[in-house]
């Protein structure tokens, strides 16, 4: 087997994109989970250079999974479903492609609670000002899971509201360019 990417660590809940450097054709694709991990992944897709999703003809791997947490969840389009093994060592899953293909892009989303910036969803950022929440405006989420606002007050207390479907909110500040949750 050929290792085409190693995930060093994940600090953000969002979709991640990998562009493999190897340009050959693959017949099999596999994700090998680190030890002490159950292979928790919500979504995992492979694409060719034309940006078509590569179709699988057979799933393979560790199927000693928790109920409703099988490999079919990896490409069901539901960010809340996920693969979850009973095992913690040597956990892997993959598939045989319908035909050998170049893999131009891999997109994956770790297991999450869907509490991150989502593409196409509307958000509104507020800051606390003398006893009331003031709006800094509405923005639409992008694939990179980044919202950019101008004229944001320094040393303020913020709250981001997902206007599309949000009900859980936490306040936060920025310190040295990093978001601090309270």
Go through each PLM region and give its residues.
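Non-cytosolic beta-sandwich-type ligand-binding/adhesion modules
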Residues: 1-7, 109-145
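Residue-level detector of beta-strand structural context in well-folded domains
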Residues: 18, 93, 123, 145-147
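A broad, low-specificity signal marking well-ordered, structured residues that form hydrophobic/aromatic
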Residues: 29, 93-95, 123, 158
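Disordered, acidic Ser/Thr/Pro-rich linker "stalks" and the adjacent N-terminal cap
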Residues: 1-25, 36-103, 111-118, 163-182
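Noncatalytic modules at the cell exterior or secretory-pathway interfaces
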Residues: 21-34, 150-164
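Ser/Thr- and Asn-enriched, surface-exposed coil loops between beta-strands
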Residues: 12, 25-27, 89, 141-145, ...
């Amino acid at each position: 087997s050929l290792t085409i990417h190693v995930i060093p660590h994940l600090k953000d809940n969002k979709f991640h994109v990998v562009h493999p450097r190897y340009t050959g054709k693959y017949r099999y694709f596999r994700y090998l989970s680190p030890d002490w991990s159950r292979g928790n992944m919500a979504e995992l897709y492979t694409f060719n250079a034309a940006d078509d999703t590569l179709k699988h003809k057979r799933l393979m791997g560790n199927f000693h999974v928790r109920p409703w947490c099988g490999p079919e969840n990896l490409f069901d389009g539901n960010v809340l479903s996920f693969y979850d093994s009973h095992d913690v060592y040597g956990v892997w899953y993959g598939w045989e492609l319908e035909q050998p293909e170049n893999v131009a892009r891999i997109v994956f989303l770790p297991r999450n609670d869907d509490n991150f910036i989502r593409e196409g969803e509307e958000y509104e950022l507020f800051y606390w000002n003398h006893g009331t929440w003031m709006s800094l405006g509405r923005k639409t989420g992008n694939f990179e899971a980044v919202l950019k606002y101008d004229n944001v007050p320094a040393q303020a207390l913020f709250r981001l509201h997902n206007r599309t479907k949000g009900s859980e909110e936490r306040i936060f500040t920025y310190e040295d360019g990093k978001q601090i949750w309270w």
